[in-house]
Amino acid sequence: QRQMCIRDSYSTDTKLGLGLVAAGLYRTDRNDMLLPPSNVSLFGDVSTVGFYMLGIRGTHIFPQDKYRLDYTLYFYSFPSKFWGIGYDMGKVDANESDLDRWQAQVKASFLFRIADNLYVGPMASYDYVHGKNMERPELLEGMNLTTANYGVGLSLAYDSRDVLTNPHKGYYLNITQCFRPKFLGNDYAFSTTDLRTSYYHPVWKGGLLAGELRGTFNFGNPSWAMMALLGNSYSMRGYYEGRYRDKHKIEGQVELRQHVWKRNGVVVWIGAGTVFNKFSALCMGRVLPNYGIGYRWEFKKNVNVRLDYGFGKNGQSGFIFNINEAF
């Protein structure tokens, strides 16, 4: 199954734009109806503020679900904002400064099934970030504007979801450990532990309760561009991506999804998150709230186009237009 649409888009970060979305679901063995469908999404966007992006992501499930290939490839150029590093810098409106950023990422993991719903395998990543026209370079604290980051590691996943792109039931856990040592050519040596877990439970006819917890923990010396960021189209929706950044982050959300009529549905969610440079700095006073509402249109079976409006602390808010559920 393949479909494509061209649509107007708007977000608080990138303003008015024109986007392209193409999505496909397929089975590597058409005779095995118990095999979860693989998925691939091609996405592109260009906006009135000079933002442009092109990328592809997906999961390829091999016959009998013996192996899985997860992949992401994208690049974008964005006249963005930068507040500095740490929670205290991000909360000060006066720290807002302009920064032009060009970024590319290639990331993939190849997983072997070692038991029912349990997978493990190697992963690799490459990130290139080029910053220029920095309005207040002192906010970088002496770090390079341009960095290239090479990483290798291991990924462990438990996945009992019925559908990857739009789960109706099941549990998902992924732990990825990525190492970026100096001998791979990195300017900044550090390692990253990513944790993501989510649960999906039907509550009544057409209603689904979904919950998620995410964490990113950097150990060593990550550059400003590779730190943990709050705010994107998947979590802490409504916050400007990267306004709050530090070595570590923890964030969670609970979302109620309700089918309304034919291809139409709505969601509401609440969440919270924070960034910190060491675990002893964790405190309730630095937890940022998040909540929002959204509309869903079934682009194709088990593939939703979503329009979300998220709210955060001190009047922060933003629109998000994307494909597939946030988690």
Predicted regions and their residues:
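Short, small-residue-biased leader/transition segments that mark boundaries at the very start
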Residues: 2-5
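Transmembrane beta-barrel strands of outer-membrane/channel proteins
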Residues: 8-10, 20, 40-46, 56, ...
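Residue-level signature of outer-membrane beta-barrel architecture
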Residues: 10, 24-26, 46, 60-62, ...
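Residues that define the transmembrane beta-barrel architecture of outer-membrane proteins
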Residues: 14-18, 36-38, 50-54, 100-104, ...
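Sequence/structural signature of outer-membrane beta-barrel proteins
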Residues: 25-29, 43-49, 76-80, 128-133, ...
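Repeated loop/turn-to-beta-strand initiation elements of outer-membrane beta-barrel proteins
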Residues: 29-31, 65-69, 116-120, 163-165, ...
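C-terminal outer-membrane beta-barrel translocator/porin domains of Gram-negative envelope proteins
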Residues: 152-157, 161-259
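Outer-membrane beta-barrel "beta-signal"
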Residues: 153-154, 293-299, 316-327
